[in-house]
Protein backbone atom coordinates (compact mmCIF):
# COMPACT_ATOMS: atom_id res chain seq x y z
CA UNK A 1 0.00 0.00 0.00
CA UNK A 2 1.39 3.41 -1.00
CA UNK A 3 2.13 5.88 1.87
CA UNK A 4 -0.11 8.95 2.23
CA UNK A 5 0.74 11.93 0.01
CA UNK A 6 2.07 13.97 2.96
CA UNK A 7 4.50 11.23 4.06
CA UNK A 8 7.96 11.07 2.48
CA UNK A 9 10.70 8.48 2.91
CA UNK A 10 14.02 10.09 3.81
CA UNK A 11 17.39 9.40 5.40
CA UNK A 12 18.79 11.34 8.37
CA UNK A 13 22.53 11.34 9.04
CA UNK A 14 24.63 12.30 12.03
CA UNK A 15 28.39 12.14 12.45
CA UNK A 16 29.60 8.86 14.03
CA UNK A 17 26.10 7.38 14.00
CA UNK A 18 24.23 4.89 11.82
CA UNK A 19 21.82 6.81 9.51
CA UNK A 20 18.11 6.59 10.19
CA UNK A 21 15.64 5.73 7.44
CA UNK A 22 12.35 7.31 8.43
CA UNK A 23 8.94 8.15 7.04
CA UNK A 24 8.48 11.88 7.60
CA UNK A 25 4.90 12.99 8.15
CA UNK A 26 4.74 16.55 6.78
CA UNK A 27 1.62 17.22 8.83
CA UNK A 28 3.52 16.65 12.08
CA UNK A 29 5.17 19.70 13.72
CA UNK A 30 8.87 19.93 13.02
CA UNK A 31 9.67 20.01 16.75
CA UNK A 32 7.97 16.62 17.16
CA UNK A 33 9.90 15.17 14.22
CA UNK A 34 13.17 16.42 15.72
CA UNK A 35 12.34 14.85 19.09
CA UNK A 36 11.70 11.47 17.45
CA UNK A 37 15.01 11.66 15.56
CA UNK A 38 16.92 12.65 18.70
CA UNK A 39 15.22 9.95 20.78
CA UNK A 40 16.29 7.30 18.26
CA UNK A 41 19.92 8.32 18.91
CA UNK A 42 19.32 8.82 22.66
CA UNK A 43 20.04 12.55 22.41
CA UNK A 44 18.45 14.74 25.13
CA UNK A 45 17.33 18.36 24.60
CA UNK A 46 16.04 18.06 21.03
CA UNK A 47 15.51 21.83 20.98
CA UNK A 48 19.28 22.20 20.66
CA UNK A 49 19.25 20.48 17.28
CA UNK A 50 17.96 21.17 13.79
CA UNK A 51 17.69 19.37 10.47
CA UNK A 52 19.60 20.49 7.41
CA UNK A 53 19.76 19.38 3.81
CA UNK A 54 22.89 17.25 3.60
CA UNK A 55 24.13 18.66 0.29
CA UNK A 56 24.77 22.08 -1.25
CA UNK A 57 24.54 24.99 1.20
CA UNK A 58 23.18 22.73 3.97
CA UNK A 59 20.12 24.90 4.41
CA UNK A 60 18.22 24.56 7.65
CA UNK A 61 14.79 22.92 7.51
CA UNK A 62 12.02 25.20 8.77
CA UNK A 63 8.24 25.10 8.74
CA UNK A 64 8.39 27.41 5.72
CA UNK A 65 10.62 25.27 3.51
CA UNK A 66 9.94 21.74 4.78
CA UNK A 67 7.74 20.94 1.76
CA UNK A 68 10.93 20.96 -0.34
CA UNK A 69 11.79 17.63 1.32
CA UNK A 70 10.99 14.92 -1.23
CA UNK A 71 11.17 11.15 -1.32
CA UNK A 72 14.81 10.12 -1.20
CA UNK A 73 16.04 13.37 0.39
CA UNK A 74 19.05 13.08 2.68
CA UNK A 75 19.02 15.29 5.77
CA UNK A 76 21.53 15.65 8.57
CA UNK A 77 21.06 16.42 12.25
CA UNK A 78 23.09 19.43 13.32
CA UNK A 79 23.26 22.13 15.94
CA UNK A 80 20.25 24.49 15.97
CA UNK A 81 20.90 27.74 14.07
CA UNK A 82 20.63 29.94 17.17
CA UNK A 83 23.20 27.86 19.08
CA UNK A 84 25.46 27.59 16.01
CA UNK A 85 25.32 31.37 15.56
CA UNK A 86 26.25 31.84 19.24
CA UNK A 87 29.17 29.42 18.92
CA UNK A 88 30.60 30.97 15.79
CA UNK A 89 30.24 34.54 17.08
CA UNK A 90 32.17 33.50 20.19
CA UNK A 91 34.80 32.05 17.84
CA UNK A 92 35.18 35.47 16.21
CA UNK A 93 36.44 36.79 19.55
CA UNK A 94 39.01 34.04 19.95
CA UNK A 95 42.50 35.17 20.84
CA UNK A 96 43.82 32.61 18.38
CA UNK A 97 44.12 33.80 14.78
CA UNK A 98 43.45 30.25 13.61
CA UNK A 99 40.33 30.10 15.81
CA UNK A 100 38.96 33.32 14.28
CA UNK A 101 39.73 32.07 10.78
CA UNK A 102 37.92 28.75 11.32
CA UNK A 103 34.89 30.54 12.80
CA UNK A 104 34.76 32.87 9.78
CA UNK A 105 35.06 29.99 7.32
CA UNK A 106 32.17 28.14 8.94
CA UNK A 107 30.13 31.33 9.22
CA UNK A 108 30.67 31.99 5.51
CA UNK A 109 29.43 28.50 4.60
CA UNK A 110 26.15 29.01 6.49
CA UNK A 111 25.64 32.74 5.71
CA UNK A 112 23.61 32.11 2.49
CA UNK A 113 20.91 30.46 4.65
CA UNK A 114 18.32 33.08 5.65
CA UNK A 115 17.38 31.29 8.89
CA UNK A 116 20.98 31.22 10.06
CA UNK A 117 21.65 34.77 8.79
CA UNK A 118 18.76 36.15 10.88
CA UNK A 119 20.14 34.46 14.00
CA UNK A 120 23.59 35.97 13.38
CA UNK A 121 22.20 39.45 12.64
CA UNK A 122 19.94 39.39 15.72
CA UNK A 123 23.03 38.68 17.87
CA UNK A 124 24.91 41.73 16.53
CA UNK A 125 26.91 39.53 14.14
CA UNK A 126 27.24 42.31 11.58
CA UNK A 127 28.70 44.61 14.23
CA UNK A 128 31.23 41.94 15.24
CA UNK A 129 32.25 41.40 11.64
CA UNK A 130 32.40 45.17 11.24
CA UNK A 131 34.81 45.37 14.17
CA UNK A 132 37.14 42.86 12.50
CA UNK A 133 36.97 44.85 9.27
CA UNK A 134 37.51 48.21 11.01
CA UNK A 135 40.36 46.98 13.23
CA UNK A 136 42.23 45.59 10.21
CA UNK A 137 44.63 43.63 12.45
CA UNK A 138 44.99 40.98 9.75
CA UNK A 139 45.04 42.31 6.17
CA UNK A 140 45.09 38.84 4.61
CA UNK A 141 42.72 35.88 4.71
CA UNK A 142 40.89 36.81 7.93
CA UNK A 143 39.95 40.25 6.55
CA UNK A 144 38.87 38.71 3.21
CA UNK A 145 36.69 36.14 5.01
CA UNK A 146 35.13 38.86 7.19
CA UNK A 147 34.30 41.00 4.14
CA UNK A 148 32.79 38.04 2.27
CA UNK A 149 30.69 37.02 5.29
CA UNK A 150 29.54 40.64 5.77
CA UNK A 151 28.51 40.91 2.10
CA UNK A 152 26.71 37.55 2.23
CA UNK A 153 24.69 38.53 5.32
CA UNK A 154 23.80 41.96 3.89
CA UNK A 155 22.61 40.32 0.66
CA UNK A 156 19.52 38.98 2.48
CA UNK A 157 18.17 42.53 2.82
CA UNK A 158 17.43 42.13 6.53
CA UNK A 159 19.54 45.23 7.27
CA UNK A 160 19.72 48.30 5.02
CA UNK A 161 23.05 49.43 3.58
CA UNK A 162 22.09 52.94 4.69
CA UNK A 163 22.62 51.92 8.34
CA UNK A 164 26.38 51.48 7.91
CA UNK A 165 28.49 53.94 9.88
CA UNK A 166 30.71 56.55 8.25
CA UNK A 167 33.89 55.27 10.04
CA UNK A 168 33.18 51.75 8.75
CA UNK A 169 32.74 52.95 5.14
CA UNK A 170 35.89 55.06 5.43
CA UNK A 171 37.86 52.03 6.61
CA UNK A 172 36.68 50.01 3.60
CA UNK A 173 37.67 52.95 1.40
CA UNK A 174 41.16 52.73 2.93
CA UNK A 175 41.47 49.12 1.76
CA UNK A 176 40.57 50.23 -1.77
CA UNK A 177 43.08 53.07 -1.71
CA UNK A 178 45.96 51.14 -0.11
CA UNK A 179 48.93 49.93 -2.13
CA UNK A 180 50.27 46.37 -1.70
CA UNK A 181 46.91 45.18 -0.37
CA UNK A 182 46.07 41.47 -0.47
CA UNK A 183 44.60 40.61 -3.90
CA UNK A 184 41.60 38.86 -2.32
CA UNK A 185 40.63 41.87 -0.17
CA UNK A 186 40.32 44.72 -2.69
CA UNK A 187 37.67 43.15 -4.98
CA UNK A 188 35.52 42.51 -1.90
CA UNK A 189 36.06 46.05 -0.61
CA UNK A 190 35.14 47.45 -4.04
CA UNK A 191 32.02 45.25 -4.14
CA UNK A 192 30.94 46.48 -0.71
CA UNK A 193 31.40 50.12 -1.75
CA UNK A 194 29.41 49.47 -4.94
CA UNK A 195 26.47 48.24 -2.82
CA UNK A 196 26.77 51.27 -0.54
CA UNK A 197 26.88 53.70 -3.49
CA UNK A 198 23.85 52.17 -5.21
CA UNK A 199 21.78 51.99 -2.00
CA UNK A 200 22.57 55.17 -0.05
CA UNK A 201 22.92 58.61 -1.70
CA UNK A 202 24.56 60.02 1.47
CA UNK A 203 27.16 57.29 1.84
CA UNK A 204 27.54 57.26 -1.96
CA UNK A 205 28.70 60.89 -1.78
CA UNK A 206 31.20 59.87 0.90
CA UNK A 207 32.57 57.10 -1.34
CA UNK A 208 32.73 59.53 -4.29
CA UNK A 209 34.73 62.04 -2.27
CA UNK A 210 37.07 59.46 -0.71
CA UNK A 211 37.85 57.18 -3.68
CA UNK A 212 39.76 59.16 -6.35
CA UNK A 213 38.99 58.34 -9.96
CA UNK A 214 42.72 57.85 -10.46
CA UNK A 215 42.65 55.03 -7.91
CA UNK A 216 39.89 53.26 -9.82
CA UNK A 217 41.92 53.70 -13.02
CA UNK A 218 44.84 51.94 -11.31
CA UNK A 219 42.58 49.00 -10.40
CA UNK A 220 41.16 48.88 -13.93
CA UNK A 221 44.62 48.52 -15.42
CA UNK A 222 45.65 45.42 -13.47
CA UNK A 223 45.73 41.89 -14.87
CA UNK A 224 43.44 40.57 -12.11
CA UNK A 225 40.11 40.24 -13.96
CA UNK A 226 38.03 40.08 -10.77
CA UNK A 227 39.61 43.27 -9.41
CA UNK A 228 39.17 44.94 -12.81
CA UNK A 229 35.47 43.98 -12.91
CA UNK A 230 34.76 45.21 -9.38
CA UNK A 231 36.55 48.50 -10.09
CA UNK A 232 34.37 48.98 -13.19
CA UNK A 233 31.29 48.14 -11.11
CA UNK A 234 32.11 50.83 -8.53
CA UNK A 235 32.93 53.32 -11.30
CA UNK A 236 29.55 52.84 -13.02
CA UNK A 237 27.79 53.01 -9.62
CA UNK A 238 29.48 56.37 -8.89
CA UNK A 239 28.56 57.66 -12.34
CA UNK A 240 24.94 56.58 -11.92
CA UNK A 241 24.73 58.35 -8.55
CA UNK A 242 26.19 61.62 -9.89
CA UNK A 243 24.22 64.61 -11.17
CA UNK A 244 24.29 65.12 -14.97
CA UNK A 245 26.88 67.91 -14.59
CA UNK A 246 29.06 65.80 -12.27
CA UNK A 247 28.75 62.82 -14.59
CA UNK A 248 29.90 64.85 -17.58
CA UNK A 249 32.85 66.20 -15.60
CA UNK A 250 33.81 62.69 -14.44
CA UNK A 251 33.56 61.18 -17.91
CA UNK A 252 35.54 64.03 -19.46
CA UNK A 253 38.31 63.45 -16.91
CA UNK A 254 38.31 59.67 -17.48
CA UNK A 255 38.48 60.16 -21.25
CA UNK A 256 41.40 62.58 -20.82
CA UNK A 257 43.14 59.82 -18.89
CA UNK A 258 42.62 57.51 -21.92
CA UNK A 259 40.15 55.18 -20.20
CA UNK A 260 38.21 54.74 -23.44
CA UNK A 261 41.30 53.57 -25.32
CA UNK A 262 42.27 51.25 -22.48
CA UNK A 263 38.80 49.65 -22.37
CA UNK A 264 38.85 49.16 -26.13
CA UNK A 265 42.33 47.64 -26.34
CA UNK A 266 42.78 45.86 -23.02
CA UNK A 267 39.29 44.84 -21.91
CA UNK A 268 37.09 44.44 -25.00
CA UNK A 269 39.94 42.98 -27.07
CA UNK A 270 41.63 41.15 -24.22
CA UNK A 271 42.74 37.56 -24.76
CA UNK A 272 40.61 36.53 -21.76
CA UNK A 273 36.87 36.17 -22.45
CA UNK A 274 34.70 39.07 -21.33
CA UNK A 275 32.61 38.04 -18.31
CA UNK A 276 28.87 38.72 -18.15
CA UNK A 277 29.31 41.18 -15.27
CA UNK A 278 31.92 43.23 -17.12
CA UNK A 279 29.73 43.19 -20.26
CA UNK A 280 26.88 44.62 -18.20
CA UNK A 281 29.04 47.38 -16.75
CA UNK A 282 30.32 48.30 -20.22
CA UNK A 283 26.68 48.49 -21.36
CA UNK A 284 25.94 50.82 -18.40
CA UNK A 285 29.01 52.95 -19.19
CA UNK A 286 27.94 53.23 -22.84
CA UNK A 287 24.39 54.18 -21.80
CA UNK A 288 25.75 56.89 -19.48
CA UNK A 289 28.05 58.20 -22.24
CA UNK A 290 25.14 58.45 -24.66
CA UNK A 291 22.98 59.89 -21.88
CA UNK A 292 25.14 63.03 -21.96
CA UNK A 293 23.42 63.83 -25.26
CA UNK A 294 19.96 63.92 -23.67
CA UNK A 295 19.95 67.60 -22.60
CA UNK A 296 20.74 68.69 -26.19
CA UNK A 297 18.18 66.23 -27.54
CA UNK A 298 15.46 67.71 -25.31
CA UNK A 299 16.33 71.39 -25.83
CA UNK A 300 14.62 73.17 -28.76
CA UNK A 301 16.45 75.83 -30.74
CA UNK A 302 16.03 79.29 -29.27
CA UNK A 303 15.32 81.73 -32.14
CA UNK A 304 16.58 84.59 -29.94
CA UNK A 305 19.97 82.98 -29.22
CA UNK A 306 22.72 84.80 -31.08
CA UNK A 307 25.04 81.76 -30.83
CA UNK A 308 22.47 79.40 -32.36
CA UNK A 309 21.62 81.84 -35.16
CA UNK A 310 25.34 82.06 -35.97
CA UNK A 311 25.60 78.26 -36.02
CA UNK A 312 22.75 78.08 -38.56
CA UNK A 313 24.45 80.72 -40.70
CA UNK A 314 27.74 78.75 -40.48
CA UNK A 315 25.90 75.69 -41.76
CA UNK A 316 24.52 77.66 -44.70
CA UNK A 317 27.82 79.37 -45.47
CA UNK A 318 29.76 76.07 -45.44
CA UNK A 319 27.45 74.82 -48.20
CA UNK A 320 26.94 77.88 -50.41
CA UNK A 321 29.69 80.44 -49.75
CA UNK A 322 33.28 79.57 -50.77
CA UNK A 323 35.81 80.23 -48.04
CA UNK A 324 36.47 83.95 -47.61
CA UNK A 325 33.63 85.00 -49.94
CA UNK A 326 30.21 86.38 -49.14
CA UNK A 327 27.60 85.81 -51.83
CA UNK A 328 25.34 88.48 -50.36
CA UNK A 329 27.99 91.23 -50.36
CA UNK A 330 26.69 94.44 -51.85
CA UNK A 331 23.03 93.36 -51.71
CA UNK A 332 20.35 95.20 -49.82
CA UNK A 333 19.19 93.78 -46.50
CA UNK A 334 15.90 92.52 -48.03
CA UNK A 335 17.68 90.83 -50.96
CA UNK A 336 20.19 89.27 -48.57
CA UNK A 337 17.39 87.90 -46.34
CA UNK A 338 15.59 86.54 -49.38
CA UNK A 339 18.78 84.86 -50.62
CA UNK A 340 19.45 83.31 -47.21
CA UNK A 341 15.89 82.01 -46.96
CA UNK A 342 16.22 80.40 -50.42
CA UNK A 343 19.54 78.80 -49.47
CA UNK A 344 18.10 77.40 -46.24
CA UNK A 345 15.31 75.78 -48.28
CA UNK A 346 17.98 74.35 -50.63
CA UNK A 347 19.72 73.06 -47.54
CA UNK A 348 16.63 70.97 -46.89
CA UNK A 349 14.81 72.94 -44.20
CA UNK A 350 11.04 72.84 -44.52
CA UNK A 351 10.68 76.50 -43.50
CA UNK A 352 12.47 79.56 -44.75
CA UNK A 353 13.16 80.21 -41.05
CA UNK A 354 15.16 77.08 -40.05
CA UNK A 355 14.61 77.74 -36.34
CA UNK A 356 11.06 76.43 -36.76
CA UNK A 357 12.34 73.02 -37.96
CA UNK A 358 14.56 72.67 -34.88
CA UNK A 359 11.87 73.54 -32.33
CA UNK A 360 10.82 69.87 -32.31
CA UNK A 361 12.12 67.75 -29.40
CA UNK A 362 13.54 65.27 -29.74
CA UNK A 363 15.96 65.82 -31.50
CA UNK A 364 16.20 69.52 -30.60
CA UNK A 365 19.70 71.00 -30.70
CA UNK A 366 21.29 67.56 -31.08
CA UNK A 367 20.29 67.58 -34.76
CA UNK A 368 22.02 70.95 -35.22
CA UNK A 369 25.11 69.59 -33.43
CA UNK A 370 25.18 66.64 -35.83
CA UNK A 371 24.83 68.79 -38.93
CA UNK A 372 27.58 71.17 -37.78
CA UNK A 373 29.88 68.26 -36.91
CA UNK A 374 29.37 66.73 -40.36
CA UNK A 375 29.97 70.07 -42.12
CA UNK A 376 33.21 70.65 -40.16
CA UNK A 377 34.66 67.13 -40.00
CA UNK A 378 33.71 66.05 -43.52
CA UNK A 379 33.39 69.35 -45.46
CA UNK A 380 33.81 67.76 -48.90
CA UNK A 381 31.14 65.12 -48.25
CA UNK A 382 28.87 67.80 -46.78
CA UNK A 383 29.22 70.15 -49.76
CA UNK A 384 28.77 67.30 -52.21
CA UNK A 385 25.59 66.12 -50.44
CA UNK A 386 24.01 69.59 -50.35
CA UNK A 387 25.05 70.85 -53.79
CA UNK A 388 24.26 67.57 -55.54
CA UNK A 389 20.70 67.61 -54.21
CA UNK A 390 20.00 71.35 -54.27
CA UNK A 391 20.83 71.56 -57.97
CA UNK A 392 18.44 68.79 -59.04
CA UNK A 393 15.15 69.79 -60.64
CA UNK A 394 13.57 66.38 -61.09
CA UNK A 395 11.98 66.19 -57.61
CA UNK A 396 14.51 63.54 -56.60
CA UNK A 397 16.51 65.83 -54.32
CA UNK A 398 17.27 64.47 -50.84
CA UNK A 399 16.66 67.24 -48.23
CA UNK A 400 19.77 67.37 -46.04
CA UNK A 401 18.32 69.22 -43.03
CA UNK A 402 15.05 67.29 -42.89
CA UNK A 403 16.97 64.02 -43.30
CA UNK A 404 19.43 65.00 -40.57
CA UNK A 405 16.68 65.88 -38.12
CA UNK A 406 14.83 62.63 -38.69
CA UNK A 407 18.04 60.58 -38.71
CA UNK A 408 19.03 62.03 -35.33
CA UNK A 409 15.66 60.94 -33.92
CA UNK A 410 16.19 57.48 -35.42
CA UNK A 411 19.70 57.08 -33.96
CA UNK A 412 18.53 58.23 -30.51
CA UNK A 413 15.76 55.65 -30.67
CA UNK A 414 18.02 52.79 -31.83
CA UNK A 415 20.63 53.60 -29.17
CA UNK A 416 18.07 54.29 -26.38
CA UNK A 417 19.47 57.75 -25.66
CA UNK A 418 17.88 59.16 -22.50
CA UNK A 419 16.36 55.85 -21.38
CA UNK A 420 17.17 54.45 -17.90
CA UNK A 421 19.82 51.72 -17.73
CA UNK A 422 18.53 48.17 -17.75
CA UNK A 423 19.37 45.94 -14.79
CA UNK A 424 20.33 42.99 -16.95
CA UNK A 425 21.45 44.14 -20.40
CA UNK A 426 24.91 43.38 -21.75
CA UNK A 427 24.19 44.90 -25.16
CA UNK A 428 27.10 47.31 -25.63
CA UNK A 429 28.67 48.18 -28.99
CA UNK A 430 32.50 47.90 -29.06
CA UNK A 431 32.78 50.66 -31.67
CA UNK A 432 31.57 53.27 -29.16
CA UNK A 433 34.76 52.64 -27.17
CA UNK A 434 36.95 52.69 -30.28
CA UNK A 435 36.12 56.23 -31.35
CA UNK A 436 35.99 59.73 -29.88
CA UNK A 437 32.73 61.60 -30.60
CA UNK A 438 31.25 58.22 -31.49
CA UNK A 439 27.62 59.39 -31.81
CA UNK A 440 28.49 62.26 -34.16
CA UNK A 441 30.83 59.99 -36.16
CA UNK A 442 28.03 57.44 -36.46
CA UNK A 443 25.75 60.22 -37.74
CA UNK A 444 28.33 61.14 -40.42
CA UNK A 445 28.35 57.56 -41.71
CA UNK A 446 24.57 57.29 -41.47
CA UNK A 447 23.71 60.52 -43.30
CA UNK A 448 25.88 59.47 -46.23
CA UNK A 449 24.21 56.06 -46.17
CA UNK A 450 20.82 57.81 -46.28
CA UNK A 451 21.83 59.79 -49.37
CA UNK A 452 23.13 56.62 -51.04
CA UNK A 453 19.93 54.72 -50.24
CA UNK A 454 17.82 57.66 -51.46
CA UNK A 455 19.52 57.46 -54.85
CA UNK A 456 19.24 53.66 -54.99
CA UNK A 457 15.48 53.97 -54.36
CA UNK A 458 15.16 56.87 -56.84
CA UNK A 459 13.09 58.49 -54.13
CA UNK A 460 11.12 61.72 -54.23
CA UNK A 461 9.91 63.89 -51.35
CA UNK A 462 6.77 61.75 -51.13
CA UNK A 463 8.96 58.69 -50.44
CA UNK A 464 10.74 60.27 -47.47
CA UNK A 465 9.14 58.02 -44.82
CA UNK A 466 9.82 54.90 -46.91
CA UNK A 467 13.49 55.82 -47.21
CA UNK A 468 13.73 56.36 -43.46
CA UNK A 469 12.21 52.91 -42.87
CA UNK A 470 14.84 51.31 -45.10
CA UNK A 471 17.66 53.28 -43.43
CA UNK A 472 16.37 52.25 -40.01
CA UNK A 473 16.49 48.62 -41.11
CA UNK A 474 20.00 49.02 -42.52
CA UNK A 475 21.27 50.60 -39.31
CA UNK A 476 19.47 48.19 -36.96
CA UNK A 477 20.69 45.09 -38.81
CA UNK A 478 24.28 46.37 -38.83
CA UNK A 479 24.28 47.49 -35.19
CA UNK A 480 23.01 44.02 -34.24
CA UNK A 481 26.23 42.57 -35.70
CA UNK A 482 28.21 44.57 -33.09
CA UNK A 483 31.03 45.64 -35.41
CA UNK A 484 34.24 46.24 -33.49
CA UNK A 485 35.05 49.59 -35.14
CA UNK A 486 33.36 52.46 -36.96
CA UNK A 487 35.21 51.54 -40.17
CA UNK A 488 33.86 48.00 -39.99
CA UNK A 489 30.39 49.43 -39.36
CA UNK A 490 30.77 51.68 -42.43
CA UNK A 491 31.83 48.72 -44.58
CA UNK A 492 28.99 46.46 -43.44
CA UNK A 493 26.22 49.05 -43.58
CA UNK A 494 27.22 50.22 -47.07
CA UNK A 495 27.22 46.61 -48.25
CA UNK A 496 23.60 46.36 -47.09
CA UNK A 497 22.18 48.12 -50.15
CA UNK A 498 18.52 48.81 -50.86
CA UNK A 499 18.55 45.80 -53.19
CA UNK A 500 19.97 43.59 -50.43
CA UNK A 501 17.31 44.84 -47.99
CA UNK A 502 14.61 43.97 -50.54
CA UNK A 503 16.15 40.52 -51.01
CA UNK A 504 16.19 39.90 -47.27
CA UNK A 505 12.60 41.09 -46.95
CA UNK A 506 11.51 38.86 -49.83
CA UNK A 507 13.30 35.85 -48.38
CA UNK A 508 11.64 36.40 -45.02
CA UNK A 509 8.24 36.93 -46.66
CA UNK A 510 8.59 33.83 -48.85
CA UNK A 511 9.60 31.81 -45.85
CA UNK A 512 6.50 33.01 -44.02
CA UNK A 513 4.18 32.51 -47.01
CA UNK A 514 5.79 29.20 -47.98
CA UNK A 515 5.10 27.73 -44.60
CA UNK A 516 1.41 28.56 -45.11
CA UNK A 517 1.01 27.17 -48.65
CA UNK A 518 -1.48 24.21 -48.85
CA UNK A 519 1.09 21.61 -50.08
CA UNK A 520 3.45 22.68 -47.33
CA UNK A 521 0.68 22.48 -44.74
CA UNK A 522 -0.27 19.00 -45.93
CA UNK A 523 3.33 17.81 -45.78
CA UNK A 524 3.75 19.42 -42.39
CA UNK A 525 0.78 17.48 -41.02
CA UNK A 526 2.30 14.21 -42.25
CA UNK A 527 5.68 14.99 -40.76
CA UNK A 528 4.31 16.58 -37.59
CA UNK A 529 4.56 13.51 -35.29
CA UNK A 530 8.15 12.85 -36.32
CA UNK A 531 9.08 16.54 -36.11
CA UNK A 532 7.46 16.90 -32.70
CA UNK A 533 9.42 13.89 -31.50
CA UNK A 534 12.68 15.39 -32.74
CA UNK A 535 11.86 18.78 -31.22
CA UNK A 536 10.98 17.15 -27.91
CA UNK A 537 14.21 15.15 -27.97
CA UNK A 538 16.29 18.24 -28.79
CA UNK A 539 14.64 20.34 -26.09
CA UNK A 540 15.04 17.64 -23.45
CA UNK A 541 18.71 17.37 -24.41
CA UNK A 542 19.08 21.15 -24.07
CA UNK A 543 17.36 21.09 -20.67
CA UNK A 544 19.67 18.30 -19.51
CA UNK A 545 22.70 20.37 -20.57
CA UNK A 546 21.42 23.15 -18.30
CA UNK A 547 21.85 26.93 -18.35
CA UNK A 548 23.54 29.57 -16.19
CA UNK A 549 21.20 32.31 -14.95
CA UNK A 550 21.89 35.60 -13.16
CA UNK A 551 20.30 36.21 -9.80
CA UNK A 552 18.25 39.41 -9.96
CA UNK A 553 17.26 41.41 -6.90
CA UNK A 554 14.63 44.14 -6.71
CA UNK A 555 17.42 46.69 -6.24
CA UNK A 556 20.01 45.95 -8.88
CA UNK A 557 21.65 43.42 -11.11
CA UNK A 558 23.55 40.83 -9.11
CA UNK A 559 26.88 39.28 -10.03
CA UNK A 560 25.83 35.92 -8.58
CA UNK A 561 25.02 33.00 -10.84
CA UNK A 562 22.93 29.90 -10.48
CA UNK A 563 22.63 26.84 -12.69
CA UNK A 564 19.53 24.80 -13.51
CA UNK A 565 19.23 21.58 -15.49
CA UNK A 566 16.94 18.61 -15.99
CA UNK A 567 18.11 15.31 -14.53
CA UNK A 568 19.12 12.58 -17.03
CA UNK A 569 15.96 10.61 -16.21
CA UNK A 570 13.84 13.73 -16.92
CA UNK A 571 12.10 13.49 -13.52
CA UNK A 572 13.73 16.29 -11.53
CA UNK A 573 14.88 19.91 -12.08
CA UNK A 574 18.21 20.31 -10.29
CA UNK A 575 19.60 23.74 -9.44
CA UNK A 576 21.99 25.64 -7.20
CA UNK A 577 24.42 28.57 -6.93
CA UNK A 578 27.72 28.53 -8.86
CA UNK A 579 30.74 30.81 -9.05
CA UNK A 580 31.41 32.88 -12.19
CA UNK A 581 34.22 31.50 -14.32
CA UNK A 582 33.67 27.93 -13.12
CA UNK A 583 32.52 25.36 -15.67
CA UNK A 584 28.97 23.93 -15.63
CA UNK A 585 28.47 21.77 -12.50
CA UNK A 586 27.44 18.13 -12.65
CA UNK A 587 23.76 17.44 -11.87
CA UNK A 588 24.79 15.43 -8.79
CA UNK A 589 26.59 18.45 -7.28
CA UNK A 590 23.50 20.71 -7.43
CA UNK A 591 21.86 20.94 -3.98
CA UNK A 592 18.26 21.81 -4.87
CA UNK A 593 15.66 19.61 -6.57
CA UNK A 594 12.16 20.15 -7.93
CA UNK A 595 10.24 17.06 -9.12
CA UNK A 596 8.72 17.59 -12.56
CA UNK A 597 5.53 15.96 -11.25
CA UNK A 598 5.04 18.92 -8.86
CA UNK A 599 5.17 21.55 -11.63
CA UNK A 600 1.86 23.31 -12.25
CA UNK A 601 2.55 25.72 -15.06
CA UNK A 602 5.12 27.79 -16.99
CA UNK A 603 4.61 31.56 -16.85
CA UNK A 604 6.26 34.18 -19.06
CA UNK A 605 6.58 37.97 -19.24
CA UNK A 606 4.26 40.09 -17.11
CA UNK A 607 2.60 37.02 -15.60
CA UNK A 608 5.80 36.20 -13.68
CA UNK A 609 5.77 37.21 -10.00
CA UNK A 610 9.30 38.68 -10.11
CA UNK A 611 8.25 40.95 -13.02
CA UNK A 612 5.07 42.09 -11.27
CA UNK A 613 7.13 42.99 -8.18
CA UNK A 614 9.55 45.14 -10.23
CA UNK A 615 6.89 47.39 -11.73
CA UNK A 616 6.56 48.57 -15.31
CA UNK A 617 9.41 51.06 -15.81
CA UNK A 618 11.28 51.29 -19.12
CA UNK A 619 14.34 49.69 -17.54
CA UNK A 620 12.30 46.55 -16.92
CA UNK A 621 11.12 46.13 -20.51
CA UNK A 622 13.94 43.75 -21.38
CA UNK A 623 13.51 41.95 -18.06
CA UNK A 624 9.87 41.33 -18.97
CA UNK A 625 10.85 39.92 -22.37
CA UNK A 626 13.37 37.51 -20.82
CA UNK A 627 11.43 36.51 -17.70
CA UNK A 628 9.80 33.14 -17.08
CA UNK A 629 8.68 31.26 -13.97
CA UNK A 630 7.92 27.66 -13.09
CA UNK A 631 5.04 27.36 -10.61
CA UNK A 632 4.91 24.23 -8.48
CA UNK A 633 3.16 22.69 -5.49
CA UNK A 634 4.73 23.74 -2.19
CA UNK A 635 2.56 21.93 0.34
CA UNK A 636 -0.87 23.47 0.19
CA UNK A 637 0.48 26.62 -1.51
CA UNK A 638 1.80 27.51 -4.93
CA UNK A 639 5.49 28.47 -5.11
CA UNK A 640 7.65 29.78 -7.95
CA UNK A 641 11.11 29.21 -9.40
CA UNK A 642 11.92 32.50 -11.15
CA UNK A 643 14.28 32.93 -14.10
CA UNK A 644 15.72 35.69 -16.29
CA UNK A 645 16.92 34.14 -19.58
CA UNK A 646 20.49 35.13 -20.60
CA UNK A 647 19.28 36.22 -24.06
CA UNK A 648 16.26 36.25 -26.38
CA UNK A 649 17.80 33.32 -28.25
CA UNK A 650 17.91 31.25 -25.06
CA UNK A 651 14.37 32.40 -24.25
CA UNK A 652 13.19 31.16 -27.65
Swiss-Prot record:
InterPro entries: ARM-like, ARM-type_fold, ELMO_ARM, ELMO_dom, ELMO_domain-containing, PH-like_dom_sf, PH_domain. It holds the Pfam family ELMO_CED12. Residues 307-479 form the ELMO domain. The gene is ELMO3. GO terms for biological process: actin filament organization; apoptotic process; cell motility; phagocytosis. Keywords: Apoptosis, Cytoplasm, Phagocytosis, SH3-binding. This is Engulfment and cell motility protein 3. Probably interacts directly with the SH3-domain of DOCK1 via its SH3-binding site. Part of a complex with DOCK1 and RAC1. Interacts with ADGRB3.
